[in-house]
Amino acid sequence: MAEELFTPHNIIVTGGCGFIGSNFVHYVYNNHPDVHVTVLDALTYAGNLENIRGILGDRVEFVHGNICDAELLDKIVPGHDAIVHYAAESHNDNSIANPEPFLKTNVEGTFRLLEAARKYDCLLYT
């Protein structure tokens, strides 16, 4: 007997205002009308709210925040089926002069998401 595929209906997309994240959000919006998306983005140099502004509404909501903020994750993760994790410090040349934001976001932030996913029984795609 074939297994049923898990279909999430309420997802969080971290980094959803960046290039890759916003394209994923648009894909979900255009191809999965039964899915609600919560975009979590810190809107640093790589994120732009304009990338998703046209689809904000009933099915797509925006939360301005940082993935390192455990209290914020405790507020928004419950009730979601899955987290799709695109948030990252990605301009690696900047890490030479200032590696701390890269460690904070890419390592600690991912850890915080893993902990929240475990705590609230939520799948994490990273």
Language model features with spans:
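N-terminal Rossmann-like NAD(P)+-binding domain of SDR-like oxidoreductases, especially those catalyzing
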Residues: 1-125
